[in-house]
Design a protein with these regions (language model features):
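Compact beta-sheet-dominated domain cores in extracellular/mature segments
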Residues: 1-106
Length: 106
C-alpha cells in the first residue's frame, strides 16, 4: 500500500489519517482513528508522519496548501516527527517515486 499517514501527536501516536496520493490541502480533512486529536482538522495539526511506501518513494509535506512554500521530504518506510518549523504547520502533501530522496528526513 502507498500511503502517507499523518499523526496528531509526535512519535506517530494519537489519531491518524492516511492519504493515498497527493493532497492539495489538509484543511478539509480530519484525523479519523481513535486517540488524541480524533476529529480535529489535519491542516496545521500534524506532528508526525509515516511514509508507508517502499524505500524508492518519497513523501513530501508542505507549509502551504497547493504544494507550495517550504517543504520536508521523508523517505519511504520512515516514521518521523515533523521538524519544529513544520509541526502543526502542515498544509499539503504529495508522494512520488523518487528512486530514493536526498535532503533532510532521508
Amino acid at each position: 500500500m502507498q500511503e502517507t499517514c499523518f499523526y496528531f501527536n509526535s512519535n506517530t501516536s494519537g489519531s491518524m489519517i492516511d492519504y493515498e496520493g497527493d493532497q492539495y490541502t489538509h484543511h478539509d480533512d480530519y484525523f479519523i482513528t481513535s486517540g488524541s486529536g480524533q476529529n480535529q482538522v489535519v491542516g496545521n495539526n500534524a506532528a508526525s508522519l509515516f511514509c508507508n511506501m517502499g524505500p524508492l518513494f518519497t513523501c513530501k509535506t508542505y507549509f502551504n496548501s497547493g504544494y507550495s512554500g517550504d517543504s520536508f521530504k521523508t523517505l519511504g518506510g520512515k516514521r518521523v516527527n515533523l521538524p519544529t518549523w513544520l509541526k502543526n504547520n502542515n498544509a499539503s502533501s504529495e508522494s512520488y517515486y523518487s528512486g530514493g530522496c536526498s535532503g533532510p528526513g532521508c
